[in-house]
Amino acid sequence: MAGGGAGVAKRLGTLLSGLLECGAFCGIIFGWASLVFVLKDLGYFKDLCQPTATPSPNRTLLPDCSWQDEQFSLVFTIGSFMNNFVTFPMGFIFDRFGTTVARLIAISLYTGGTLLVAFSTPELAVLLFPAMSMLSVGGILLLLTNMQVGNLFGKYRSIIITLYNGAFDSSSAIFLIIKVLYEHGLSLRAMFLFMAACSAWHLLRTLFLMPRTHIPYPLPPAYDYGLRCPGRSQSYRTYEEKRPPGEAGPEETPLEPSAPRGARGDGDPPGVSFRACVCSRVFAWHVAWLSVMQLRHYLFIGTLNPLLDHLARGDSHLVSTYTNAFAFTQLCGVLCAPWNGLILDRHKRGKTPRPEGAVGALADLRASVLSLVVTVTLCVLFSVCAAVPMLPVQFATFVLQVLSRSFLYGGNAAFLAIA
């Protein structure tokens, strides 16, 4: 870490508070199966259930609630779609206007989503559609603003990025906590009002522990961020003010000494435009690969509750047990994701220093090959287990799902950071 500027305590505070934010708020929509159990018990979309002549194992007639399941699946599908569709414009806002503006938008969306769920009723179940979309978009935008925290920790950058993505995965267990508290008598409205009140904490973190614009990489001397006491000596802002007008800032500083303005060395690669990056084969294939893998996980999460209900033959106690097991495995995402970071950063921990410039970037890309292979292998094993229509096998499916998802999202974020 660079000396001066933000101290170790402040950086650790940013790291740990960001870990808590990602692990408790950002990806809660992916715990949808646990929330569906509560919503069904409250009677959301119950008017879509139709009487049927099919008896249950205890010889009682069960209603056909397939249309109800379809509505719940549609809520999750739209929410998860918005999670991906809005990422691009939100990324533009983040790049163009900086961290503070992006986080204020995220906090507003997240607060609105929690309030919509809090004030929804079985008669106003349609509020779940905008609510889950707002929670999804607000959560992913909070994650985007947090991933730059890895820039504060140099050679541990990929590990921290994957750790945050693992915490994002683990946040799906929040709906399990809501389910358990609901079963112990706490109302759904009270719990979501509490989550809305937590937005005050997000706001304080935005002001004091996050930069106004972006955290540059590599860090300039005496870099600082957040609100500071007046009269503090060295800071990134004073560094910027003292910089001569023609000198490049930290975010513009190349990794290697540049040639004089207007000249370019023989070995210097030309600058790459945004359009060239987006249209490159590496990016196109990576997006296609990510889309297929992500679709598999979304299908599993969105249909988990009706799948368990089918395999358990309507036994609500058994469905609750397996839903809890699935949610508990999601907590392990934050523990599994750093393994991928260790794979990605393994070449940086040797005795030989990491080369700079294009050679170093190529070494980072080569290190990502093993990560991609492991991720694909885990996803294939997860899909095989998910295809077996036996309840006990689903325990293995849950474990492989959280491993695959943690490697997928953490590896994706780290790959895009180094590619």
State each model region's role.
Residues 28-39, 268, 274-338, 409, ...:
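Extracytoplasmic gate region of multi-pass secondary transporters
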Residues 1-41, 45-69, 257-284:
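Cytosolic juxtamembrane N-terminal segment immediately preceding the first transmembrane helix
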